[in-house]
């Protein structure tokens, strides 16, 4: 099978094309979980671009429980193309500057994100088939995906890893109360994610 135009690699510059887009319950960047897995039951659907809607490309994927998604921080793109070496991570309350490479800030030289998600199912029926249903995603609706890889526990898990400043930062979770009338507006399967 021929490869779609992926661009050349001239002097280390590579052009990439989205292979898919993710459909989530987050139409804007506000409200999205800050990290993947923070809302483990929240499902999303991955819809492949036509050149990549080939069931053969997914053969063997059903044997994996988790996936890596490589994607673009599409809502954080700056028109001027500039980046800043220092950012203020929300994990530190937005008050302490840190080097961009010590953070997961979307404002990076190359605005690329990496998320670990749970694979719920592969659907081979429907107009957009095949599609993937995943859980625990931290992406905005319509986010372009550049690659999908299986999560390999024997090499991707590092129990001895340390978390730098993020490990010792305060937990900024808020207690949220949803009135029953508002909960009734949500499908029951999505209520568990709240």
Go through the PLM ranges and name each one.
Residues 1-116, 122-194:
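Glycine-rich, low-complexity intrinsically disordered segments
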């Amino acid at each position: 099978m021929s490869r779609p135009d992926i661009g050349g690699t001239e002097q280390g510059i590579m052009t990439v094309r989205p292979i898919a887009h993710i459909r989530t319950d987050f139409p804007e960047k506000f409200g999205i979980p800050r990290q993947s897995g923070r809302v483990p039951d929240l499902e999303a659907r991955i819809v492949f671009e036509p050149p990549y809607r080939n069931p053969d490309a997914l053969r063997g994927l059903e044997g994996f429980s988790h996936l890596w998604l490589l994607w673009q921080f599409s809502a954080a793109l700056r028109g001027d193309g500039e980046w800043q070496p220092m950012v203020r991570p929300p994990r530190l309350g937005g008050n302490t500057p840190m080097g961009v490479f010590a953070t997961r800030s979307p404002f990076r030289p190359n605005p690329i994100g990496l998320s670990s998600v749970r694979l719920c199912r592969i659907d081979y029926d429907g107009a957009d088939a095949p599609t993937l249903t995943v859980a625990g995603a931290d992406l905005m609706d319509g986010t372009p995906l550049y690659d999908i890889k299986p999560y390999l526990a024997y090499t991707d898990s590092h129990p001895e890893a340390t978390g730098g400043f993020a490990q010792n930062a305060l937990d900024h979770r808020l207690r949220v109360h949803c009135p029953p009338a508002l909960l009734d507006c949500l499908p029951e399967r999505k209520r568990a994610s709240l």
